[in-house]
């Protein structure tokens, strides 16, 4: 159970066998644990997620490619900054089986029937009484068959930063691939760095999802010159060119459709010539808007030339996923 990850520090064989090691924890918090295997006997009763108030361990010496994930968080339990924070997993070690969960620090958690089913399901799997997958999941991003037929290709592969480079090669290496997410983490008092795709595009459709924490700020640059603003402005609720979904310093979105910080938002942008259309969370907020100049923070002023996708990383924490692109003739 949870405390076993806080034992035998300094014994690599034990840590390797378990799959992770306790590092620290913050205050008890309400978290939404995301279910990574809807068919596994330890977690299938949870459905898509399990919300619990508990003390959440932060782990080290953990490798996604060595375990089969069962429950995880996509943000820090206390700060809510984006990132991969594993909660439960299973694996095979030789002819033996390992099931681990970091939940269970409170009496009310132990009394929760869903938690009891979680523990019992994991034990039954480890004893070989029920079947369940134990192979590490593949976090590489692949577009759907429908999108592939339509010409879309992944721009971020979900597993590493291949195909991307820092705008400033000497800047802080704040970007990393975490469990299918492209995450920008900036330590307190530090300054992050923009990240730029190696490939350049002129006319295209790009689709992506992003999650921004409270108070943060980022941007998605078309051709490295036209910024679709990303901002936590949910409480503000006002239409501004500098607001979420705005073409920065150029045009406010036509509708306010921002989601709460910490929630995933979906976007689609089409640029053909100097005309830009943007969909945010399924709603069209810019419709064939003529954007004939760079909008600030851009790579250059060559607005009619192909350019890369650039993600703003110098303003705050952000996570992207499922970035895919289709070039237009």
What are the language-model segments listed below?
Residues 73, 93, 105, 210-212, ...:
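Short beta-strand segments enriched in hydrophobic/aromatic residues
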Residues 20-94:
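Catalytic beta-strand/loop cores that center a nucleophilic Ser/Cys/Thr
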Residues 8-11, 35-39, 63, 82, ...:
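A structural signal for well-ordered alpha-helical scaffolds and beta->alpha junctions
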Residues 4-35, 43-52, 123, 130, ...:
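Carbohydrate-interacting regions of secretory-pathway proteins
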Residues 1, 94, 179:
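Single, functionally critical "micro-switch" positions that shape active/binding sites
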Residues 76-85, 92-142:
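Extracellular ligand-binding/catalytic regions of CAZymes and related secreted enzymes
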Residues 1, 68-71, 98-102, 183, ...:
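Structural recognition of the beta-strand scaffold that forms the well-ordered cores
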